[in-house]
Amino acid sequence: MGNETSLPMEMCSNFDADEIRRLGKRFRKLDLDNSGALSVDEFMSLPELQQNPLVQRVIDIFDADGNGEVDFKEFIQGVSQFSVKGDKLSKLRFAFRIYDMDNDGYISNGELFQVLKMMVGNNLKDTQLQQIVDKTIGFADKDEDGKISFDEFCSVVGNTDIHKKMVVDV
């Protein structure tokens, strides 16, 4: 990877050239079939993600072009959101996108249910989970349109330190 590849990466990420080189090495190690893109299985070889119930959602968000794989540019842009230099708003937007599965700018009752179901599995009955979803929507949905906008999401989680936990070491 020469300078011609890393310079645009620096411009579209929170990483400097050395960090991009290190990430490039990590990417190439993960790219087991040398295809230039990471499949879901290759992503799952990351120990940090193996136990994460939301790994598929993370991959979906990283996969900007929706082709089912994450190329190096998508990888850099995705991981960049978890950089210590990443800003709070970007981290909140990423967290919001985990829940906004259809990417329409809102978290619906059904989307919140699906994501929470991924997290809790069968530890709660669906009726219990639905009660939590309904209460959460009722609490966060200030304009009472039945869904949570990004602004409403930020009103609820923006005062927490969630963005400080959304950091990976490069």
UniProtKB/Swiss-Prot annotation:
Which cysteine pairs make disulfide bonds?
A: none
Q: Which GO terms describe its biological process?
A: calcineurin-mediated signaling; meiotic cell cycle; neurotransmitter secretion; sarcomere organization; sleep; vesicle-mediated transport
Per the record, a Pfam family?
EF-hand_7
List ligand-binding residues for Ca(2+) 3.
D100, D102, D104, Y106, E111
Any one GO MF annotation of this record: phosphatase binding
- Reply yes or no: does the keyword DNA-binding apply: no
Residue ranges constituting the EF-hand domain according to the UniProt record: 18-46, 50-85, 87-122, 128-163
Matching InterPro entries: EF-hand-dom_pair, EF_Hand_1_Ca_BS, EF_hand_dom
Question: Could you list the residue ranges that cross the membrane?
Answer: none
UniProt name for this protein: Calcineurin subunit B type 2
Which species is this record about? Answer: Drosophila melanogaster
